[in-house]
Curated annotation (Swiss-Prot):
This is UDP-N-acetylglucosamine 1-carboxyvinyltransferase. Pfam families: EPSP_synthase (PF00275). The lineage of its organism: Bacteria, Pseudomonadati, Pseudomonadota, Alphaproteobacteria, Hyphomicrobiales. It comes from Nitrobacter winogradskyi (strain ATCC 25391 / DSM 10237 / CIP 104748 / NCIMB 11846 / Nb-255). It catalyses: phosphoenolpyruvate + UDP-N-acetyl-alpha-D-glucosamine = UDP-N-acetyl-3-O-(1-carboxyvinyl)-alpha-D-glucosamine + phosphate. Keywords: Cell cycle, Cell division, Cell shape, Cell wall biogenesis/degradation, Cytoplasm, Peptidoglycan synthesis, Pyruvate, Transferase. GO terms for cellular component: cytoplasm. UDP-N-acetyl-alpha-D-glucosamine binds at R102, R131, P132, V133, D134, L135, D316, I338. The active site is at C126. The modification 2-(S-cysteinyl)pyruvic acid O-phosphothioketal is found at C126.
Amino acid sequence: MDRIRIVGGNRLNGTIPISGAKNAALPLMIAALLTEETLILDNVPRLADVAQLQRILGNHGVDIMSAGKRPGDHEYQGQTLHISAASVIDTTAPYELVSKMRASFWVIAPLLARMHEARVSLPGGCAIGTRPVDLLILALEKLGARIAIDGGYVIASAPAGLRGAEVAFPKVTVSGTHVALMAATLASGTTVITNAACEPEIVDVADCLNKMGARVSGAGTPRIVIEGVGRLGGARHTVLPDRIETGTYAMAVAMTGGEVLLRGARPELLQAALDVLTEAGAEITPNNEGIRVARNGAGINPVTVSTAPFPGFPTDLQAQLMALMTRARGTSHITETIFENRFMHVQELARLGARIHLDGETATIEGIETLRGAPVMATDLRASVSLVIAGLAGEGETMVNRVYHLDRGFEQLEKKLSACGASIERIRA
C-alpha cells in the first residue's frame, strides 16, 4: 500500500494548477445516462473516484473514451471524456461497484428517468435514516416512482415515466438535489425543488443539462424549477475548477509560508474560506490567472468557524483548517454542523503534537509553535490531506499511510506540492 513521505519545514513558492472539480465531474458523468447521444466533458480530473465511476457506467453498457494530455504534460488541463450511453444494457448497479463510492448511487436517477426502472445497491455501510439516501428516495417517490428495498437493493420503477411534482427537502442535501434535478429533466410536467442545495457544483450540472436541452432555472438558489422535456441530446461542457482543492492548497501555503499562484482558481466559488484565510493572516489576491496566496513573515491568527452549506464555510475544508490552526497564535474553535463523526483526523493530528479538545461537534484547538513529524494513518479523503498539510510544517519526517484516500480526490498532489518546493514523495508498495 502506497505511503506519502514528507520532510517538513520548506516554504511553498510557485504555481499550482487547479484541477476540475470531482464533485461536479461525478454527477456530470452520471448525467450522460440521460441521453442516447454523446456527452463530452472537458477538464475531468484523473482520480480514483472518476476511474471507479467509469467502471460503474461501463457495467451499464456506457462507452467512455478518454483523451487529452497526461498529467505533467505542458498545459495539461485534465482529461476529456467522450461518454456515450446509446445502448444501456443493464439497469442494475451491483453492490461490489456501488460499495466503493457513495456517489455512484446517483445513477438511480437517470436510469429511472430514461429507462423507467433501476435496481441499485445501497452504498456500503449506509443505513436508511442516517445517511442522505432516505432523502434521495423521498425525491424519487415525490416524482411518482415506486420504490422497494429488498436484499440491500433499492428497486425503483416508473412504468409510465416520472411526473413533475414539488420536492421539498426537510434539510439541505447536495445528493438529494443532484438526484431530483437529474430525474426531473425527463419527467412530464414541472418540478419545483425547494430547500435545494446551492453549491457551485449544482449550478455546473444544471448548466450542462441545459446545454443538453433541459429546461432548468434557479440553480444556485434554494428553489430550482425544472420543466420536463421528452428527450435530451448530446453536448460539450467544461468541468468547473475544484474549490476544495483550491482551499486545500491555499491552507497549505498559509501553513508553510511562501507565495503560490493557484492557476485557474475562481474566488467566487469559495469566498467564505478565503475570508477565513485572510482573518488567519494569509494574503489573498485574485487576478486574471487565478488566486495568489501568500504568507510572508506574519504568524497564523486563530479563528472561530462553523461549517455551513454554500455559501458558508465548506465542511470539506474543515480538516484542512484544523491542521492550519494547530500552529495559530492562540485558541481556535471549529464547529462541524453538516456531518456526524467528521473529527477522525483529530487523533492523528495529535500524534504530530497538536492540542485539540473535542466537545460534541466543536473542536477547540490550542495553537503551538512547532509540530513534530510522526507516522500517521489517513482515515478518509479530507482527513488524509489535513495530515499532509500538518506534515509540511512539522519538524522532521511525517509518513502518511493509507494514501489511497488521497487518490480519490486530489490529482497529482505530491507532484504539485513538490514543484513548489515541498519535500514530499510517494513511496510505492
